[in-house]
Every structure is written in structure tokens, then in C-alpha cells.
Design a protein with these regions (language model features):
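S-adenosylmethionine
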Residues: 1-451
Length: 451
């Protein structure tokens, strides 16, 4: 163990920030890992799994605690609540951790945080759970289908009902189950204007990275087994970009021709913009826009690392019409702010933050941005609309609104997206991906031509 570091205490600090201040666990986790780069690989993996697992399984963990505790989780002090969830996650979902260690370390943390009088309570609840873990029964799926799926997959009941209504119970179950599959690998897109996919694969293997061919996109790879991307020469040289396969489809749908002028209106962290810059192979120009200096900084970091000269980043509010950009773009990419219900595997806290009323607000925001974005497209040019959600209000129903209110028509995706992906979407020009059905994030895109 690295001297002076208590990994469980580090996890607790992250989870407390999430609990008390609504912080984003993925952001805090990255900041912590970046700060303590000297941590051993095993410790980094333990911290990551403990934080991510405790967040993604929160409702399940609370169900277990409430089965044996006289004090409901909701009435516990935030520190104790977080300690309990962490310990229960280790007991139920981390086979490598002895139950006794999970209990003892939780008691030590409670004491260290000043809750000496509650150490007996913490110890009693956790040891009871350890003894009873094989006999605790989850809600019956036939009698209480919504509650059963909610507890089993740690998804709020309103969201279980919504997804089940929109796509059917079986698709909902597959979607929720997929949140816990194939954890630990990430998908990358090789920048083929810099290196071939085969050369990049060999280089990654020489760097000790496990590499698999990803599905649906030729230059997509799945990688795992590395310590930190920042240490990889192939990453430093900009040979690849971290990007889910679903997100890569936006660049393929945009299908830019040599010399094209492209505007990506909500671009951070820049994956789609860099993809189309790569497809342009040094020609044309991509303007990658976003709202804040921080987001523009993220785009600029990736541009600098990848070394492309045909792309620039610019701070701009997509809700405000940019008169100077009227009829200036051959392609506009509108990957807009959305509910994020397709990326719960990567950002599991979204399912606890989101609500139906927020979805409705996002629909209005998307329409405001789209009314501006259509002005930037040349007549006959392309607008690609995309979201990382499965909410129909933001996807299919938003397309209905676009066709009724904007000078756009849907155009076929058959020349740029594989038949295998298109077979599950009935509407020409649209693509809806579902986790558990396709091997991707949940994602939607629609390709339009300006008329």
C-alpha cells in the first residue's frame, strides 16, 4: 500500500461530496487519480471500483441496509450513510474483500470521522448483513415488477416505468442489465490520418495494453489493462481519441467531403469534431464551439494532443444566434445537451439526478439551439442531430418537431451506417441505439438536409 494513503477514506470523501453537494463522482474520481499518480495500480483500481460501484448500486445497497437496520438509510447522517453504502458494496459485490475487513474498516472510518457513539450500530448492521446476505430476498418480479427492477438494477421507479413503457419490459431489463456488463474497458477511435488501425493496435500491445476489435466501426478498438492513458505514448502522440462507437457514428453520418466547412455547436470535449477533422484529412475546417472557457479548454487540449491543423475551438453560446455564421457551413453537428439516459454505465449518477420535468426542459433547450443551428447550414447542406439518451421526447418526437418547424428533411443513413445497426430502427434517416440490444451506449442520431 502507498504510504500515508487510506483508499477507503479517499472514496468516502468523494462520495460525501456527491451526497452533500451534488458533485459529479466521475469528475472527482479523475481529479483524485490525477492528484495521486504515484498510487499503486491495485489501489487505483480498488478506489475506482469502490466509488463507481457504490454510486451505481446505491438503491440496491440501501434496500439491503433497510432490511436489517432499525434506522432507515434516509434518516442516517450523511457520513454514516456513505460509510454504510461503501461497506455493503464490498460485502455483496467485491468478492476479493473479506466481509470482516469491510466491517472493520467501516467502523474505523466512523470513529475517525467523530462518530464514536455509532461504531456499535455500524458494526451490528454490517455483521448482520454479512450473516444474512444469502437469505435476503429481493422484491418479487411478478407481484411488484417495477419495484423489483428498481431494486435489482438500482434504477429509480419512475425511470423503470418510462423505459418499460417506451421500449417494453424485456428491452428495459436488457438495458438495465447491460449497465453492469463489460466494465473496465473503454472504446477508442484511431485517428487514421495519423496512423493505421493495425499499427496503432501493435503499438498499444507493445505498451502492455489489452486490445480488442470493437464492433460496427472499422477503426474502433476496445482497450483495457492500462494504468493511466496519460502514460501511453500512443495517447500522447494523438494516435487515438477516447470515444464510444455510438458517438463515432455522428462523424460517419456527417460524411464530410474534402474541403468542407463544419460547425460543431456543442462540441466538448471534442471527440466528434476531431473525428470529422480526421475524416477531412487536412482539408476544410472544423469550428468546435462550446459555452464555457473550461469546455473550450477541453477541446483545445484534445486538438493540441492530436495535432490537427484544420480545427479550431471557440467559446460561443449555442442559444444565441450567430449572425456571422449564416449559410456558412456544409455540415452542422448538433450533439445537444440531453438527459444522458443512454450513458448510465459511464455516468451512473444521472439516473438519480434526472426527472421527467428536467427532460421536458431539455427538450425546449434543444429546440432553441436547433432554431439557431439550422441558420448556419447552407441550402443543400447537412445537419446531424444527436443525443446520448433513449428518451423518446428528445429523439423521435424531437424529429417530428424539426420536420414541422424547420426547413429540413430526413435523408437516408444507408450509405454511411452499417445495415446491422439500422435494422432495429424503422424510420429512414434516424438511428436509435439501445444498451443491451446493440453493443454501444444508448444513442440517437438523425441526418437532415436543408431545403
Amino acid at each position: 500500500m502507498t504510504n500515508g494513503l487510506n483508499v477507503r477514506e479517499m472514496a468516502l470523501e468523494i462520495l460525501l461530496e456527491v451526497e452533500k453537494n451534488g458533485a459529479y463522482p466521475n469528475v472527482l474520481l479523475k481529479q483524485t487519480l490525477d492528484k495521486y499518480l504515484y498510487m499503486e495500480k491495485q489501489e487505483r483500481a480498488f478506489l475506482t471500483r469502490l466509488v463507481e460501484g457504490t454510486v451505481e448500486r446505491k438503491l440496491t445497497l440501501e434496500y439491503y441496509v433497510n432490511k436489517v437496520s432499525k434506522t432507515p438509510v434516509g434518516k442516517m447522517k450523511p457520513v454514516i450513510r456513505c460509510i454504510m453504502r461503501m461497506a455493503v458494496y464490498q460485502i455483496f459485490f467485491m468478492d476479493s474483500v473479506p466481509d470482516s475487513a469491510a466491517c472493520n474498516e467501516a467502523v474505523k472510518l466512523a470513529q475517525k470521522k467523530g462518530f464514536h457513539t455509532l461504531k456499535g450500530f455500524v458494526n451490528g448492521v454490517l455483521r448482520n448483513l454479512s450473516r444474512q446476505k444469502e437469505s435476503i430476498v429481493l422484491p418479487d418480479e411478478e407481484k411488484e415488477p417495477v419495484k423489483a427492477l428498481s431494486v435489482q438494477y438500482s434504477v429509480p421507479e419512475w425511470l423503470v416505468e418510462k423505459i418499460s413503457k417506451d421500449y417494453g419490459v424485456e428491452a428495459a431489463k436488457n438495458m438495465f442489465a447491460s449497465l453492469y456488463e463489460n466494465v473496465g474497458s473503454i472504446t477508442i477511435r484511431v485517428n487514421n490520418s495519423k496512423i493505421s488501425t493495425e499499427e496503432c493496435t501493435e503499438l498499444l500491445k507493445k505498451e502492455g495494453v489489452q486490445v480488442e476489435k470493437a464492433v460496427y466501426v472499422e477503426n474502433a478498438l476496445e482497450i483495457s489493462g492500462y494504468d493511466s492513458l496519460a502514460f501511453l505514448e500512443s495517447f500522447q502522440k494523438g494516435y487515438f481519441q477516447v470515444q464510444d462507437v455510438s458517438s463515432m457514428l455522428v462523424g460517419l453520418a456527417a460524411a464530410p467531403t474534402a474541403g468542407a466547412q463544419i460547425i460543431d455547436i456543442c462540441a466538448a470535449p471534442g471527440g466528434k469534431s476531431i473525428h470529422v477533422a480526421d475524416l477531412l484529412n487536412g482539408t476544410g475546417h472544423v469550428e468546435a464551439r462550446d459555452l464555457t472557457d473550461y469546455k473550450v479548454g477541453l477541446i483545445e487540449e484534445n486538438i493540441s494532443r492530436c495535432g490537427f491543423s484544420n480545427i479550431t475551438a471557440k467559446r460561443m453560446d449555442a442559444c444565441v444566434l450567430d449572425e456571422q455564421s449564416r449559410e456558412s457551413a456544409d455540415v452542422v453537428i448538433a450533439d445537444l445537451p440531453c438527459s444522458g439516459l443512454g450513458v448510465l454505465k459511464k455516468k451512473s449518477d444521472i439516473k438519480y439526478r434526472m426527472s421527467q420535468s428536467q427532460i421536458e426542459e431539455l427538450v425546449e433547450l434543444q429546440r432553441t439551439i436547433l432554431k439557431n443551428a439550422v441558420n448556419y447550414v447552407k441550402t443543400g447542406g447537412t445537419l446531424v442531430y444527436s443525443t446520448c439518451t433513449v428518451a423518446k421526447e428528445e429523439n423521435d418526437q424531437q424529429v417530428d418537431w424539426i420536420l414541422e418547424h424547420l426547413p429540413l428533411k430526413l435523408v437516408s443513413l444507408k450509405d454511411c451506417i452499417s445495415e446491422e445497426l439500422l435494422k432495429n430502427t424503422d424510420r429512414e434517416g434516424c438511428l436509435q441505439l439501445l444498451p443491451g440490444r446493440e453493443k454501444t451506449d444508448g444513442f440517437f442520431l438523425a441526418k437532415f438536409q436543408k431545403i
